[in-house]
UniProtKB/Swiss-Prot annotation:
Predominant location: secreted
Functional note: Cell-counting factor that limits the maximum size of the multicellular structure. May down-regulate the expression of gp24, which mediates cell adhesion.
Database matches in InterPro entries: SaposinB_dom
Family: Belongs to the countin family.
Sequence ranges assigned to domain Saposin B-type in this UniProt record: 22-106
Biological process annotations from GO: actin filament polymerization; adenylate cyclase-activating G protein-coupled cAMP receptor signaling pathway; cell motility; glucose 6-phosphate metabolic process; glucose homeostasis; hypotonic response; intracellular glucose homeostasis; maintenance of cell number
Cellular component terms (Gene Ontology): cytoplasmic vesicle; extracellular region
Biased composition (Gly residues): 249-258
Protein name: Countin-1
Signal peptide from the UniProt entry: 1-21
Protein's UniProt keywords contain Membrane: no
Disordered, as annotated region: 233-258
């Protein structure tokens, strides 16, 4: 949450009355994504919540988080805010679109130019770099660039970055992960499939204004796994880093399509 605090504080200190739509959308998605579980627990355990202040004052994180929560909640009203947070499939991007902080574009368009992983033949414990290049041909209002990696047993892990007001041009993104076995992902020997997606809205979300604009795949292999540790299921829990070029807004978050 420190990154979120710093961004919000800087914006308020520079000019509390002027926050660009791009910054506002990113702040909203970060806040909802980071605070969603806390908000759900407060809603479920607090009984009747009469005001935004009642709800937001209980969210951990201090005065800045309280203020952001109040601003978003007051905009739509406490009842509608609670309804959005309590959705059966809560989605930070969709919630921020419904609050009218993030924009949508049903005509967004993009193509994938490159999906490449290095090394293509690696070992357990090694570091892998996934490079993705894509071209936006009609502005992505609020969306994601996401990837999923499926291991030889069918388990999947992935990541995604937020895209806000990406105008037509080419963009590149790199993700890194370390193939360190854990209870969640054992990194067995064999062939792995990489899926990359560019989306308007959250990739894989069932909500309106969500579209897969482009997708592509590649493969790589891992060897050197201890056969005694080749069981396990769940999502990736190793280290992950991402870098991005182009006029894009991005933030990392856990992601899985399946």
């Amino acid at each position: 949450m420190n990154k979120l605090f710093s961004l919000i504080l800087a914006l308020f200190l520079v000019n509390s009355a002027v926050v660009s739509s791009l910054d506002s959308c990113s702040i909203c998605v970060d806040f909802v994504g980071n605070s969603l579980n806390d908000l759900l627990n407060i809603i479920l355990n607090s009984g009747v919540i009469g005001t935004c202040g009642d709800l937001c004052s209980a969210v951990p994180g201090g005065q800045i988080v309280d203020t952001v929560c109040d601003l978003l909640c007051d905009y739509v009203g406490v009842d509608e805010f609670i309804k959005l947070i309590s959705d059966v499939d809560p989605d930070p991007i969709y919630i921020c679109e419904k609050i009218s902080v993030c924009k949508t574009n049903d005509n967004a368009a993009a193509s994938l130019d490159l999906v490449q992983i290095n090394p293509q033949n690696g070992t357990v414990g090694g570091t892998f770099t996934l490079s993705i290049a894509y071209t936006v041909t009609n502005t992505i209002a609020t969306g994601q660039l996401a990837f999923n990696i499926i291991d030889p047993t069918g388990n999947a892990f992935g990541d995604a970055v937020l895209l806000v007001q990406q105008s037509p041009e080419q963009y590149t993104q790199q993700f890194q992960f370390q193939a360190t076995p854990s209870e969640q992902e054992s990194f067995p020997n064999g062939l792995y499939t990489v899926q990359a997606l560019v989306c308007e809205g959250s990739c894989g979300s069932p909500h309106p204004n969500t579209y897969t604009l482009a997708n592509g795949t590649t493969t790589f292999t891992i060897s050197g796994a201890d056969s005694s540790s080749m069981s396990g299921a769940g999502s990736f829990s190793g280290s992950s880093q991402s870098t991005q070029t182009g006029a894009a807004s991005g933030s990392g978050s856990g992601f899985a399509l399946f």
